[in-house]
Amino acid sequence: MQYANRDFRGAKMDSGTRRITNTWLIREGGSASRGDFLLHSDGSVSDSKGDEDVIETIDGKNRLVTRSLQNWHTHLGMVLNRGMGEGLPLMEWLETAIFPVEKRLTGKLVEIGTRAAAAEMIATGTTYACDMYYYTQTVGETLAETGVRATLCGPITDGLTPNFKPGSGDALRHMESLINDPSPRPGRIDYGIGTHSVYVCDEEILRKGSELAKKTGSLLHIHTSETRKEVADCHAKHGMYPIEYLDSLDYFQDAESGGTVCAHCGGVTKKEMRILAGHGAHAVHCPTSNQKLACGGTMSYPAMKEAGVDVRLGTDGSASNNSLDLRAEAKAASLVQRHDHWDARILGPEQTWDLATKGSQDWITWDLSDIRMRPFGRDGRRLLSNLIYSGAKVLDVFVGGEAVRRDGRTLTLDEDVVAEELEESVTEYYQDV
């Protein structure tokens, strides 16, 4: 299922077909081709004969064209928390460094953090985020101005929601009103339901969130089996592991109806993998965050693949990664899977790139004059490997045919202003902390 594919009505530049000449293109499956290509606003690509009507012709001599990156688990506003609470395990980190300061959150702070997150995403080639954070409507309006795509899964756990009274049910009602609002949604934004986890949400909240998602055909988003402690505690309390427990509540929203995103899936049994596969759930691998917070393990990609589970990649939030660079996350995913399974054949460049770009309809270009991309060989056989494991600067980002970044400069926001605004806001946010 594709998410957030609406046309962007606030375009800063004309959208349409662009010709890019004398360039390299990474095709579906990971092969590299050189030539002249047409990038169409519907996300398709074709060879150019040179006589087509286009809105722009780009000299691609030092460019590599690829699909854009897709980030399937984020907390974008947590750019505000980047660099705080270092050296703490997950639960201590949440309870001492994150939850206490989030009580101070305001819509304005979330707007500033989200705008900074969008700037980082665009600059590193990501055009889609599946997000779970507070002030969901504000997040949507902010992201719409930048031109990126997103599915925003507002948290419905009243006790942890700074913008609603604990226990009031207002968070659930707010998300229902956002999803059912008949007026046009901002930009390329969709809404979903965020049920944080089995250790934060009680059975009633999990059931209500699932019921609302099913009633509205919306995406469900949850953290599952992120740490050994979470897995052990769930089994001790319910006699079931987290995904088994969720299935016993009829929690999952099947793929054809709206879908379910399960972030982390670190300590998951084969039975649980079969449950995920049966519901068509997206299991999101977040290797950097799992390692940084010493969660006790990361997802087993080979086992997930064997079970038929759809695996995606996510960075998690900027407070636990600390980056939103999904290209770097793709590298981390490949390396940790090889390391954990003692097998250098796992997640080669083609498979890794498929995980990082799965579902993308948009295009980005990378700077081939960047020394990190050299040598790539006259036949281009090293291009994809160099990109994943070495990296390069993002030159252009095209979303739905609209240019949101050109020649290394983002067009839909001013990065210098965004950075200064962020610095000023965190001074207030972390006052006396």
PLM regions: where:
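Active-site gating loops and adjacent loop-to-helix segments of metal-dependent hydrolytic enzymes
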Residues: 80-112, 151-172, 227-257, 279-282, ...
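Alpha-helical scaffold segments that flank or form the walls of functional sites
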Residues: 82-148, 172-185, 423-432
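Active-site microenvironment of metallo-dependent hydrolases
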Residues: 2-35, 40-42, 46, 50, ...
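Metal-coordinating catalytic core of metallo-dependent amide/deamination hydrolases
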Residues: 139-266, 271
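Divalent metal-coordination and catalytic microenvironments
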Residues: 23, 62, 73, 125, ...
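A conserved active-site cap/scaffold subdomain adjacent to cofactor or substrate pockets
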Residues: 271, 277-309, 314-315
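His/Asp/Glu-enriched, well-ordered alpha-helical/loop segment
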Residues: 248-255, 301-372, 388
